[in-house]
Amino acid sequence: MKNINPSQTSAWKALEQHFAQIKDIHLRELFEQDPDRFAKFSATFDDQILVDFSKNRITTETLKKLQALAKETDVAGAMRSLFSGEKINCTENRAVLHIALRNRSNTPMMVDGEDVMQQVNAVLAKMKDFSERVIHGEWKGYTGKGITDVVNIGIGGSDLGPYMVTEALKPYKNHLNMHFVSNVDGTHIAETLKALNPETTLFLIASKTFTTQETMTNAHSARDWFLKSAGDEGHIAKHFAALSTNGQEVKQFGIDTKNMFEFWDWVGGRYSLWSAIGLSIALSIGFENFEQLLSGAHAMDQHVANTPFEQNIPVLLALIGIWYNNFFGAETEAILPYDQYMHRFAAYFQQGNMESNGKYIDRNGHPVDYQTGPIIWGEPGTNGQHAFYQLIHQGTKLIPCDFIAPAISHNPLSDHHSKLLSNFFAQTEALAFGKSREQVDAEFATSGKTVVEVEHVAPFKVFEGNRPTNSILLREITPFSLGALIAMYEHKIFVQGAILNIFTFDQWGVELGKQLANRILPELKDDNRVVSHDSSTNGLINRFKAWR
């Protein structure tokens, strides 16, 4: 990958000039000027996903200039580096090949001169065998009973992805009850275990190193809970599996290394649901559906690798995001799925985006002079409409939004889905076009009120509009389409990181807090007054000790 400061490129400077020319143009004007705007500013993937980006504050000229930025920052070269197994995670000297985990074409994927597909396929085969034995009741607990409940213990990428996917694909789930424990707060594991039977519970301990503080604290508490009933440590092997690479620690914990599912250092945590970390997904929806999830992601990988940038959906979304973040000064993006099963999707890509591109040092080791990753947030519709949409519609912040919805519902009750989708369509229309003072006055006139009578309230009913949105309409949320959608966002994040000249696949920002926590933990063991920190931290620790 080339290390190019985007703000010093001629394309960036051209975009600055272009922004000054069009920043005040309203979406109403853009649609009036071009009745076929939707056809020109939308794209379809595999007849499964429609992405409508026409309600963005862009013109054909904007896209040309953004494409020039992608070319000048060598996004094509960055993609080649990603797909070829080059060690583009330079600060950790690692390749980035989560795409190999879902490489259904089985074409060679090289790391250090070795094709990794044999290893990938071996782990997938092991996952298939294990998941099918558990699902079909062949895997027995220590009293001879089958498994009824699966508890995934992990944090970050070892939790967010599997939890999001198992929730999104609940219509495909089998009889197994899935539970996810992540927080080191003892309440999380305690509340989860209350309703479980140790005779029929399987724990998946998801930690690459098997030393992650939060995960191993919860794992040991689960182990203690289990042994209170089982007694014999030999029974641990029937109720615990490890998603890890540290065989020594796994064995010491009591887990049979035959039940250890491996992944590799070229799999980043927030891109790991495609790996052994996805075992909970396979257990929840069955291995065939897990393979469909992989196939959908692989299809999107093929789209990204082989589609010209002018029609390349993740590239287009990445460029539009940079346009708002760096030229309009938008600081956040909202992800708003109109599907209750997708209620963790925004949280998943909050990590996916903010941990990937929340960097202020560029690939040359210098502070950047432009914006990098945005703040990502969101909740399912229509709940959000009754919570924070007020600010999106009439606030002083520009918040680009992704609206996501399936055309076909898994639960076609009465007219629920039509009402849901009517809101989906209405919100993007309202955000784009708003309501003028003239329209407000006309509405009041229709109801028989004069302008004088409503003067005090009319200004508050005006919607400026010109709020940008992408509408992402899926035919139906299936394992395949969800896999493609996730991969679409992954590649959007990668393309933005490539253009912004930052390392997308490390996460050094999480380290300092962990180091300080390890220093503070021993200080909490006694009641002695602490004076080793700043006055604020000392004061907080000492009040905690006094109150506990």
Swiss-Prot record:
**GO molecular function terms attached to this record:** carbohydrate derivative binding; glucose-6-phosphate isomerase activity; monosaccharide binding
What subcellular compartments does it reside in? Cytoplasm
**Coiled coil regions in record:** none
Chief site of localization:
cytoplasm
* Pathway linked to the protein: Carbohydrate biosynthesis; gluconeogenesis; Carbohydrate degradation; glycolysis; D-glyceraldehyde 3-phosphate and glycerone phosphate from D-glucose: step 2/4
Enzyme class, first EC level, given as a word: isomerase
Q: List the GO biological process terms.
A: gluconeogenesis; glucose 6-phosphate metabolic process; glycolytic process
Documented EC number(s): 5.3.1.9
Q: Which GO terms describe its cellular component?
A: cytosol
* Annotated catalysed reactions: alpha-D-glucose 6-phosphate = beta-D-fructose 6-phosphate
The protein's matches in Gene3D superfamilies, at most eight in alphabetical order, are given as:
1.10.1390.10, Glucose-6-phosphate isomerase like protein, domain 1
Q: Where are the disulfide bridges? A: none
**Which CDD domains does the protein's record reference?**
SIS_PGI_1 (cd05015), SIS_PGI_2 (cd05016)
One Pfam annotation, family name? PGI
Q: Does this UniProt record's set of keywords contain Nucleotide-binding?
A: no
Cross-referenced InterPro entries: G6P_Isomerase, G6P_Isomerase_C, Phosphoglucose_isomerase_CS, SIS_dom_sf, SIS_PGI_1, SIS_PGI_2
Q: Which residues form the active site?
A: 355 (proton donor), 386, 514
Keywords for this protein: Cytoplasm, Gluconeogenesis, Glycolysis, Isomerase
Respond yes or no to whether keyword Coiled coil is given for this record: no
Name of this chain's protein: Glucose-6-phosphate isomerase
Organism of provenance: Photorhabdus laumondii subsp. laumondii (strain DSM 15139 / CIP 105565 / TT01)
